[in-house]
Amino acid sequence: LVNTSSIFGIITTPNNTVYHASKFAVRGFTESLIKEMEGSNTQIHCVYPGHIGTNIAINAKFGDQIVKGENKDGILGLDGEPIKDLKGEKVSEEEAGVRFRDAGMDPDKAAKIILRGIKKNKKRIFVGIDSKLMELSQRLFPDSYLKIMPITLFLGLLFSPHRLKKVINLAIKKKA
């Protein structure tokens, strides 16, 4: 049995209470089930993916909690200001979703990591260096991990040079 939570079942960010509650519920359910099924032949795993290159940001229906909306100035961030790329150009909601997807780990690679974790009978399967680093920062700094999250994410990119290159290319990519 493989249940998928998220790194957001380990850490929390402001204004995402319902999402975190659902991911923590999957985590709690799975960890409890692992204890209940000890001694049986049933393998139970909980997957904690980090940033995987899926269409979640394109297909998601964002509310005011995540994005304040889109107007003639482009997609607005939490501060109410338009989100811009490294060239200072405004980014649409669709373009932001595409860039988010394209900067993530290849889903096939994520699947291989999950299958390897299942074969090794790992109860917790963290997918991606970002997921592992965020989980570690939460354990080491439970009250202040959000303050160091930018550093954690940057370190994740440094340990994954191909993703760092993708992120830089996407950040400076000119909209066609």
Functional labels for PLM-detected ranges:
Residues K122-L158, R163:
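A transmembrane-helix-recognition feature enriched in membrane-embedded lipid enzymes
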Residues Y19, R27:
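Catalytic tyrosine of NAD(P)H-dependent dehydrogenase/reductases that use a Tyr as the general acid/base
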Residues I11, S32-T42:
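Active-site-adjacent segment of SDR/Rossmann-fold oxidoreductases
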Residues S22:
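Active-site helix of classical SDR
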Residues G39-I129:
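SDR active-site lid
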Residues N3:
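Rossmann-fold scaffold of SDR-type NAD(P)-dependent oxidoreductases
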Residues S6:
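Residue(s) in the substrate-gating loop at a strand-loop-helix junction
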Residues I11-V18:
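Active-site loop immediately N-terminal to the catalytic Tyr-X3-Lys motif
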